[in-house]
Amino acid sequence: MSEPRSMAANAAITALSQVASMALGAVIALVILLRFGKDAETDGLFAAYGVYGVLVVVAQSFRTTIVARLAEDRSTFAALDRYLGAVGVLFAAAAIPLLVLAEPLARLLTADLGREAVDAARTSLMILWFAAGAQLAGALLAAALAVRDEFALPGAAYVAGGVVSIIALIALAPVLGIQAVALGLCIGGAATVALMLLRLLRLGYRPSAVGMVPDRTAVGRAALLVWAAAGTLSTQVAFVVTLGFAAQLGEGAPTLYTYATFLFGLFLASTAGAMTIVLAPRLAETWDGRSESLHAPLLEVFRAGLTLIAPIVGVIAVAGPAVASLVLDSDDARVLTDTVLAMSGGLVLAVAMPVPLVALYTRGRYAAVAAVGLQGVVLQFGLSAIAVGFDSLVALGFASLLTGLAGAIVLLLLTFGRGAWRVLALLGREVLLVAAVGALAFVPALWLGVLGGRALQPVMALGGLVAFVALARWLLPRHWELAQRVAGPALGRLRRWRSAPAGAGPGA
């Protein structure tokens, strides 16, 4: 048996798979935009997708919050059976909003957008119930594989599921219209589950029907799954709340806000999301429980994350309008870019959160994280109500940023106590350093892009990226080294996959 990979290698593999999976999601979004445009039907679809996303967030949280519960059991596979039974309970409960209450929920989500939007949302909710079941089961299987130090196969399975979803969407769109999106997600989710289940079977897992049958304790485990996800769940609930306010800005606004949030999620998953998934099993097994021992990993994760995030934000600022205008009109392209930039500060907050979140989950402080999440939903509702008065999606983006800032501060206080202020000072220093280097690289590129017009902006963005790499290597050698430790194994893995003989795969 090979030695366990380093955290950096596993983070890189996970980041690579998450980026690939999210990129496939971007392809789906692009197909929707090109095939169906930006109208009441797409608003209804994305309203339903927001609710489905709540269940996806619950599912994905299993990969960090439930790993410790699976790892501490004498038999990971027996524990997996029990939690699959709990997933069955959750799936049945999800039928209430997605099936039974589909019509009233669709009316609530689409505000005054009309009957066409309501019908699209209602039908999508019903179909996405099945896709949600696949997501719940798949994430639990991925958590079980993480306990075995298996990260490449789950990543590849999610990517394969995305490819299947795209193929199904393109094939079914002429027949089913906008509902081909929801059905495509169902088919892709089933493919993801099948691939991970096959890998577990190869590792010796034998599903036990008796072990999966929900009993009196299954309801308690289902509640634990939701409770453990409450902290991260709040982010998606806040998105659904904000989407409702976006609907008040008129037809097409929810679709644009969804695209902005999707881009934000793409960058988030490839940085903070990947690090959190990989940190969970390692920290659960090795952490000594002292807050002081978290300082070093927190700083390393934060430095690596900032070094990856800065060029992302810079490229969006310089080339975003030009790229977005390829599929949107110039006004919508500007709004989309500005909204993403308004949200982008949340990426900085997010790369500070993996270590505190995993530490709190390892301590079993699910209630505290849930309380922070609830605070975020309430705050987001209030800030969105104010922001919508400005008649601007960008204002809604800033509202999301302020909500994230408040939540991040509270989580640091919960993790480090009075030492949180020292931690904040250290993190603030790192932000200033990386921001200064980013400004040196991208501000000239931004001005040259403005002067040269949109045709020149992508070239200037590339120039800014090259300048950032050169400056970071010179002025921030430690940050650059950490970023390389994260990205290097991913590039090496890519080369090995490309050179692998036919029939070999990521899980081989």
Residue ranges and their predicted role:
Residues 60-75, 272-289, 302:
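Helix-loop junctions and terminal segments of transmembrane helices
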Residues 1-27, 118-123, 147, 200-201, ...:
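N-terminal membrane topogenesis motif
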Residues 19, 84-109, 299-328, 337-351, ...:
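Alpha-helical transmembrane segments of multi-pass membrane transport and lipid-handling proteins
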Residues 446-508:
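Membrane-proximal transmembrane or re-entrant/amphipathic helices at the cytosolic face
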Residues 5-64, 166, 226-248:
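Signature of the first transmembrane helix
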Residues 152, 160-194, 367, 377-409, ...:
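Membrane-interface helix-loop junctions in multi-pass transport and translocation proteins
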Residues 100, 113-141, 167, 318, ...:
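Alpha-helical transmembrane segments of multi-pass membrane proteins
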Residues 1-7, 197-235, 252, 291-292, ...:
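Interhelical loop/hinge segments that connect adjacent transmembrane helices in multipass membrane
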